[in-house]
Amino acid sequence: MLSSVPHRKTWNKSKKTVKVTRSYPTFPSLNAWEEFRGLFPVDGEPNPGVGLGVEEGLLGQMVHSPEFNLFPESVVFESNFVQVRKGRDWIDIYKTYNTMALGVTSSVPCLPLPNILLMASVKWHHGQNQTWNKPSTAPKIILKRILPLKFVELQVSDHLQRVLRLRTVTEKIYYLKLHPDHPKTVFHFWIRLIQILQKGLSITTKDPRILVTHCLVPKNSCSPSGDSQLVQKKPQASQPSESLMQLMAKGESEALCQIFVDLHQHNLFSSRSSKKTENKKDSSGKKTSPSEDSIPCTRDLSWRDSFTYGEWERENPSGPQSLSLLSTLAASTGPQLAPLIGSSI
């Protein structure tokens, strides 16, 4: 008797095992300095900062962890250093498995430059390979310092030995030697960071996502001999606009500056029309007051020679600006831009 149930085919024999090999994109050679100029991370591609150990390292993972949850939307630019003692040979203070993680970040992600310094001590297990991003065994890391960058002095102490000099507001001085596992490119990043923290960013930004409407770092007015001189001249029509830029840099409102400009032009017109009246007052023996056209809309602007803070200290940045330290440094860094040894912020 035939069964009404249809015969089921067995699919086990028809199954085939296919071995899929994934091709991962390879990192470019990181030895040449020119290869990092203009390099931006693209979605879907590995971040070159991770391979260098300057992004998503131990310090960044710690401050972004649920335990701390500090600056969760900001990128941390970091490197590992060895604390040394000042001398001819730069002797290590601690043992080889004790390092210091030094990093900078931004308290608000819309700021184009960092304003926070992070310091942490890292104690590696004996014989452990000191990989920065994902070590096999988590080392012991302790956050030591969280300081505003404007209260920290950072210098290049020894360019050949890759040593930085860091002085805190409490006059505590650290000599930090970049870990030998970091390539030379990483130290150039720190040199460039010191330079832009000292002089600020140029109005020409390499990142099109950063909207900079005007330059906030004024030019130093120096004589051909090199000595700065304060020259008093009769104010011209171009001076109110220059004063306006300085007032904007000091944080005053744009509308208030425009009022000063209009007031200065009105006083200039009224002083010319009342010139005959002032001459009559001079003949009557009364003391004359200085004419209004000799009073500019602002006072002496000689303070701008010492105006060195950057755009990140503004209360209201011009639009949302993403903080990608590695992209900014790599795009705007060149060997010719490296500062002299001993330049400080």
Curated annotation (Swiss-Prot):
GO terms for cellular component: Golgi apparatus. Residues 222-241, 271-299 are annotated as: Disordered. Residues 275-285 have a biased composition (Basic and acidic residues). Pfam families: GARIL_Rab2_bd. It is found in: Golgi apparatus. Signal peptide: none annotated. It comes from the Eukaryota. Keywords: Golgi apparatus. One of its GO terms (biological process) is acrosome assembly. Belongs to the GARIN family. RAB2B effector protein required for accurate acrosome formation and normal male fertility. In complex with RAB2A/RAB2B, seems to suppress excessive vesicle trafficking during acrosome formation. This is Golgi-associated RAB2 interactor protein 1B. The lineage of its organism: Eukaryota, Metazoa, Chordata, Craniata, Vertebrata.
